[in-house]
From Swiss-Prot:
Its main location: mitochondrion. Homotetramer. Its cofactor is pyridoxal 5'-phosphate. This is Alanine--glyoxylate aminotransferase 2, mitochondrial. Belongs to the class-III pyridoxal-phosphate-dependent aminotransferase family. Multifunctional aminotransferase with a broad substrate specificity. Catalyzes the conversion of glyoxylate to glycine using alanine as the amino donor. Catalyzes metabolism of not L- but the D-isomer of D-beta-aminoisobutyric acid to generate 2-methyl-3-oxopropanoate and alanine. Catalyzes the transfer of the amino group from beta-alanine to pyruvate to yield L-alanine and 3-oxopropanoate. Can metabolize NG-monomethyl-L-arginine (NMMA), asymmetric NG,NG-dimethyl-L-arginine (ADMA) and symmetric NG,N'G-dimethyl-L-arginine (SDMA). GO terms for cellular component: mitochondrial matrix; mitochondrion. The gene is AGXT2.
Amino acid sequence: MTLIWRHLLRPLCLVTPAPRILEMRPFLNLGASWTSVTKLSLHTKPRMPPCDFMPERYQSLGYNRVLEIHKEHLSPVVTAYFQKPLLLHQGHMEWLFDAEGNRYLDFFSGIVTVSVGHCHPKVNAVAQKQLGRLWHTSTVFFHPPMHEYAEKLAALLPEPLKVIFLVNSGSEANELAMLMARAHSNNIDIISFRGAYHGCSPYTLGLTNIGTYKMELPGGTGCQPTMCPDVFRGPWGGSHCRDSPVQTIRKCSCAPDCCQAKDQYIEQFKDTLSTSVAKSIAGFFAEPIQGVNGVVQYPKGFLKEAFELVRARGGVCIADEVQTGFGRLGSHFRGFQTHDVLPDIVTMAKGIGNGFPMAAVVTTPEIAKSLVKRLQHFNTFGGNPMACAIGSAVLEVIKEENLQENSQEVGTYMLLQFAKLRDEFEIVGDVRGKGLMIGIEMVQDKISRRPLPREEVNQIHEDCKHMGLLVGRGSIFSQTFRIAPSMCITKPEVDFAVEVFRSALTQHMERRAK
């Protein structure tokens, strides 16, 4: 594994000699009420790996003014992590810097979005060059970046997935995929898993099956949930179910080529087809690994059988690759490939543009024709020159810097290290995932698997932040830490993250004992 340009900048050093975690920068004036982070005892301060990047001096709004503007003018739905939300100022690769100059290791990458690193120099250079040439035109005119990108993206997908619709977000992509499925099948019913997140637009809210995203009013007509085949929290699961270096602590007596949990969940899927939808359906949406629900993996072989059942009912199979694509899972470039399936439609977003608004729907010529016969689909910003130039640069960086291989190597290493914490701490119920998409589920105890109360998970989350590590949250009760760093992450940085978690968990157990 090589990360070419980074090796030129950082030849040595795993840790700084005597770091001061989250050192305050007194030259920044953010108002008298801004206070230092919580002080931690000496034994809880893992050493942060070095970073040779110096952030610019912060010269914008004071922290208190930011809070006022947020309260007065921004949607109240826009909530932030932590009791004292971070005011982030600048990013460099896997690092983020706040307005006080404090440095954080970003292990959530903008909700699984910054794929090749914050402000990657090659991506930045391409964006700046395109910015000076052509920002926006329209798809009623041709421009090279769109066609160059389409050719590159199509080359990374198997036949017959070769027709590309460019849009701007995952919700847009999934809504278009819903429209395609219904236009092609002449049916209405679409199935998705409980715990699924496929967007927050009026139509995709029907596919999303998480209580906090549901309204009392009707929405997403024709969408039906089915049981999520969760081998840790669901009724069935064993010790060989997942395509992961780390399995659940649940035991089973399955032979190597057999999975009783998979068979039981398939029976539940058949039950949904028999009782909850029409004889002919439009389609089935599935994330290769559920993201927002806490990195939930299905039993091996489940999706393959489910796809066959859906097609037997006249439906199309849609893989939501918004979080799992572009090499993040390590073993394959596309998440659906890890299940040995070929979808009829693939949606992608987030990592496709490394944080620049961009998304795509890829399908077969036959399904694409079914849509255009029904309507003239148009998207003002979809396929704009800036997005396409950046998208091409992201694909080039993934290949040139072997980031898929890095995801496999470093991700497997990280999973095995976090699994040691599961064995060490009673409140770590499960460690799961593949490549650089990892979930750490917190429980009250391993036997009951009851979720650790939110306020306790919040404190562990705060402690990680105080030590310089940023991670995400997921699952129905927000009890799972979501780990999804940029694919440029290194093993020394993983070692730091594991030690931060160990320290935060130790502090939690000490608080419990008092």
